[in-house]
């Protein structure tokens, strides 16, 4: 806190800088509401020490981070805004005239879109003896080891799975077959991380 106070005082002494507030970010995709209570306590402590040094921020930006359900989006299409805002109303100690800012972009629009893509190819890897290869013709003793669906969208369209293995639900919009098979869904980009 002492470093922050010194930095703010330096900013306030500069003629072309106007200090207006603090910004706190505790992470992304947070689903445990108790984390926001802890954040409020930290901010309250920060505001107390700032006030002791005659610094009263006009703006308190609490960041975002409110998670959405990527595993079952149809069951939870809207983030839990009610409990989220109730925590700040109850636990954040701000003064009249101070404004509280929230950054809830993903929480608001994250469930509102879909990436629609089409299958370009289906590729099957076979094990024939001790040799693994991709074949278009099968041999009686060959067994499928892995099946790939190559689609026309790639990591350039949806980078989250490539960056940090984020999960997104994949739905086949055209098949009416009740038979389920396991495939690795991959894009056309020549990178090993171009997977969904």
Residue ranges of each PLM-predicted region?
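Active-site glycine- and acidic-residue-rich loops that bind
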Residues: 1-5, 29-41, 76-83, 106-112, ...
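Short, structurally constrained coil/turn elements
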Residues: 13-16, 94, 179
């Amino acid at each position: 806190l002492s470093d922050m106070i010194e930095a703010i005082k330096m900013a306030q002494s500069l003629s072309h800088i106007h200090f207006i507030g603090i910004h706190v970010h505790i992470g992304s995709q947070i689903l445990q509401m108790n984390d926001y209570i802890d954040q409020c306590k930290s901010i309250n402590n920060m505001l107390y020490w700032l006030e002791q040094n005659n610094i009263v921020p006009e703006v308190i930006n609490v960041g975002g981070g409110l998670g959405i359900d990527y595993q079952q989006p149809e069951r939870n299409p809207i983030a839990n805004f009610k409990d989220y805002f109730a925590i700040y109303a109850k636990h954040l100690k701000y003064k009249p005239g101070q404004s509280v800012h929230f950054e809830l972009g993903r929480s608001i629009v994250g469930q509102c879109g879909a990436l629609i893509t089409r299958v370009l190819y289906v590729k099957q890897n076979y094990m024939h003896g001790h040799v693994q290869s991709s074949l278009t013709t099968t041999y009686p003793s060959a067994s499928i080891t892995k099946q790939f669906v190559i689609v026309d969208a790639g990591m350039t369209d949806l980078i989250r799975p490539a960056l940090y293995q984020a999960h997104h639900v994949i739905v086949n919009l055209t098949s009416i077959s009740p038979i389920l098979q396991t495939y690795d869904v991959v894009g056309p980009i020549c990178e090993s991380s171009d997977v969904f």
